[in-house]
Amino acid sequence: MAQAAAAASQVNQIAPDPAVAFDRKVGEQYLRYAGMLARRGYVASSTGNLVMRVPHAKYPEGVCYVKCMGVSLEEMTLDDLIITDVPTGRILYGDRGTTVGHQMNREILRLRPDVNAVIHLHHDETIAFFAAGYEELKITGLTFPYLMQSYPHYLPAHINVEEDVVPIKTFIARTNCIIMKRHGFTVLGRNASECYGRTNVLVGEVKRNILAEQLAAARGTSPEYLSKEEIETMFRHGDAVMYPKAKS
């Protein structure tokens, strides 16, 4: 308990480390993905975020490039990026704080060493779909299971893992996507490209669910969704399909 309290007290503490230099190439990659998310219409406010973890010799868990509070992914510049550590949220580069959601991002990165990018967005159609009473997302197409490679984990509206990260450890090993009812979603990836692609297939699946339900209702039929067996087979073969290896 005391250790957790001590770590929490260091969140957003400005602790510049000369060993942590701002890598402009990483910053420009961050801006590229932030811009692509914004151009797709996913960015609703300053509270959505993208986090990219990069390795660092001094920090075994790497360091996080993340947007500071008060600006959106749509309007940000390189000057709005800060660098934090993973365990405590201390600001190693920059002088502005992070949003509360960065505590969730850091906990995900701490528990999932295979994950190096996290995208959190308050996506309109996702919020609306679950506000309409749907309990889970059905799968209509092949791309979602091949790329996401796990079922979404659903959090009820009364659980906010941005403010209280404790529940994350109970489910994060089994999913690459958290759907937060009345809130939005959080997507994990091994790199920024995969995380961005998974975000796109999630958004696409939400929209297809809405369209399939509307069109089927108009025709008096039921939508056709993939079966559990089909989905889980695609999960298992996801890497082979999405990232086939070159042969000599």
Predicted segment positions?
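Glycine-rich flexible loops
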Residues: 2-248
